[in-house]
Amino acid sequence: IFARTLDVFTANMSESIEKTIDISRILKSKMGAKAKFVPSFLVSWLKKTVHEDEVNRFLWESRHLQGTEWLTECVKYLKMNIQLEGVENLPDKNDGKLYTFVSNHPLGGQDGVALGSIIGTHYDGKFRYLVNDLLLNLPGLKPVSIGINKTGRQSRDFPRMVEAGFQSDNHMLMFPAGLNSRKQPDGSIRDLPWKKTFIS
C-alpha cells in the first residue's frame, strides 16, 4: 500500500511541476549560446514577473482546451467582467465574407484574450491572431495564431505570413501597434504608432 501511494504521489508531483512555460528554455531558444550570459537574478526576476508557476498551473489544468474555448477559460481564470456594447454591429457570421478586426492594445494580454474570446465565439472559432511568436509557447493559443518573429530573420517574412493568413478561410484579428499601450509624457495611456500595413 505504501509503495502504491508513493507511486501515485510521485506521478502527481511530476504532473504538477511539468512546465509548458520555461523562461530559461525560452531565453536559450531565442538567444542561443548568449543565453548563458543572462544573470541568474534577472532570469529569476523574469520568472516572477510572468508568474511562471501560476501560468504553468493554469496551462496544465486547461490543457484539454484550445482556441476559443481556451480563451474563454482564460477570461474566467483572470476573473474578467466583460460588458459588451454594439455586438449587433458585428457582421453576420453567415454572410459568406471574411473580416479583419483591428484593435488598439491598452492592456496587452487581457484585451487580446477578451477580444479573441468574443470574436471566436461569434464566428464559431474561425479567426486567427497575428501575434508575437513567443505566444506560440501557449498550447491553447497556438491553433488560432500566426506567429511573427519581430527581431529575427522571420521579420522579413512578415508580408508573406500576413498574406497567407488573409488567404485562409478565417477572420483576422490584429493589433497594429505591436505592443501594448504606453504611458505618455502627458500622463495619458495610448498605443505606440501603428505599424504600416496595407490596412493601417
Functional labels for PLM-detected ranges:
Residues 9-99, 110-114, 124, 142:
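Membrane-anchoring hydrophobic helices of lipid-metabolizing enzymes
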Residues 81-200:
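Soluble catalytic domains of membrane acyltransferases
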